[in-house]
Regions:
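Mitochondrial intermembrane space
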Residues: 3-6, 16, 21-231
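Repetitive helical segments and hydrophobic/amphipathic motifs
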Residues: 11-14
Length: 231
């Protein structure tokens, strides 16, 4: 999907799915909401922050304008509570899906990661005209219903310490979920993730690992992932 406003496309590892498009970014919790509480045992140190608090960061986003009213209501709640409820988050994605269906797409499939984060599944490559139309439609529906909510939700579940450096945010997430050794560093992550052979010291197909990556703007897909049939 092409609507994410702050995500950065990951380096195309050799493991990335072939013959399908790579969508924008992006976990199942049992509670009705997720909160932006930091862990003091994440194994990370220092680092420039996006803002002093989630509330301040959301305020910065809202000050830039161009946020649809339905999403602004959800973001205003996040400013005061530090969370986005599961019901609000799923409603935003439901509205996006319906918007795309109304534009004539056969189906919109979502992948759910262990933290509750959703991303749209990849799809088989269409014609140049089809892909151009999809990009425009996805951006339009995303901007209207879910793009800003997605970015904030990703911060809450994947980067509660608000690190400005995406790699540091990923490593912090991996530490918090005990997915890498305590001595695993950002430098090591950057070296492994920029490689072309797909070799890493952790399981890249682990859904918790992928949740850490996707919530922080890295988009990783595999040939075995579910795909949607758009046309």
């Amino acid at each position: 999907m092409s609507f994410c406003k702050t995500c950065v496309l990951a380096v195309a590892l050799s493991m990335l799915l072939a013959g399908c498009s790579i969508n924008q970014d992006a976990t199942g919790t049992s509670s009705d909401s997720v909160t932006s509480e930091s862990s003091s045992e994440n194994g990370s140190t220092g680092g420039q922050k996006l803002a002093a608090s989630l509330s301040e960061w959301v305020e910065q986003r809202e000050s830039q304008g161009n946020i649809a009213e339905s999403q602004k209501t959800i973001l205003d709640k996040a400013k005061s509570t530090g969370e986005i409820s599961t019901s609000d988050y799923e409603k935003a994605w439901s509205d996006y899906r319906q918007c795309m269906i109304d534009k004539g797409y056969k189906e919109i499939k979502l992948i759910k990661y262990p933290s509750g984060l959703y991303v749209e599944a990849g799809h088989k490559q269409g014609t140049t005209i089809q892909e151009s139309r999809y990009s425009d439609d996805s951006t339009e529906c995303g901007d209207e219903y879910v793009a800003d909510v997605q970015d904030v939700y990703g911060i809450i579940v994947g980067n509660p310490n608000l690190y400005a450096d995406q790699a540091q945010a990923v490593v912090d997430c991996l530490h918090r979920d005990s997915l890498v050794p305590k001595d695993y560093t950002v430098s090591r992550f950057n070296k492994e993730f920029s490689g072309t052979d797909g070799n890493t010291s952790f399981d890249m197909q682990n859904l918790q690992v992928r949740s850490c990556l996707v919530s922080n703007g890295y988009n990783v897909g595999y040939a075995t992932d579910d795909t949607e049939q758009l046309w």
